[in-house]
Amino acid sequence: MKKTSNAASPLIYKGDKPFKRIARTHQSDFRTNFLKVPFDPDNIYGKYGAFLMPNDANAGLNFCKDFRQEILDRIQKRYPRLTATQHDGLYANMLRSEHIPWNVFIPMAHDLSATAKVFNKILGADEIDEVTDIRIEWAPEKTKCLNDNTSFDTYIEYLHNGKTCGIGIEVKYTEEGYPFGAKERREVMENEQSRYAQVTKSCGWFITEISNRPIRETAL
């Protein structure tokens, strides 16, 4: 009989940075005290307490209870087949970011008026007249966006003065930054003629003093 534990894991992963250590402890406590399901102390990932066991993962316990079945149906439609690694990242690993868009934006899709208000507050302007669609794990046609393999964890489509606009969202479960890759640095910070530079300068969201400067001086 397989050994399991219903308690929070006492183990600390030595490779965790401060934020991830706090997040791992939080998720282990959430699994123990809210989901009330065990973890596998012998699993290479599960022994730290923030990784659901197969039956619990397949039941969708990584997803919001009130919208769980809808989320599972939408995931099945979006991903008819998942590799074992992809499945674990989305269904079992409570520290990955893959589940977050489904847990946040599926509920928001049930009240698009409230969603518009939330994003107008985030943007600090009455930019959004009406949210018309919320797409999760969506990739636009290359030539209509950044001319690469860019995909969005979530894409918010909305109307502004009768014009269709969009907000692309990348979701990360972290408070720490990610370094530029070689291609990203070249396209975002060095090539003034890149599609990234053109979109940045033409989007209208930067004041003139910034948008008129070389892209390498403005990229974060």
Region locations from a protein language model:
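Conserved catalytic cores of phosphodiester-cleaving nucleases, focusing on short active-site segments
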Residues: 154-158, 165-175, 217
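"Short basic amphipathic alpha-helical interaction patches in structured regions
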Residues: 118-122, 170-172, 181-187
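Extracellular structured ligand-interaction cores
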Residues: 99-101, 149-153, 164-168
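Short, solvent-exposed loop/turn segments at secondary-structure junctions
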Residues: 139-143, 161, 172-176
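Hydrophobic/aromatic-lined pockets within catalytic cores
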Residues: 109-113, 159, 173, 177
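Acidic, metal/cofactor-coordinating or nucleic-acid-engaging core segments within structured domains
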Residues: 177-220
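Nuclease-adjacent, charged terminal/linker segments that flank catalytic cores
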Residues: 1-144
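A Trp-anchored, charged/polar loop motif used as the substrate-binding/catalytic surface
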Residues: 145-157, 209-220
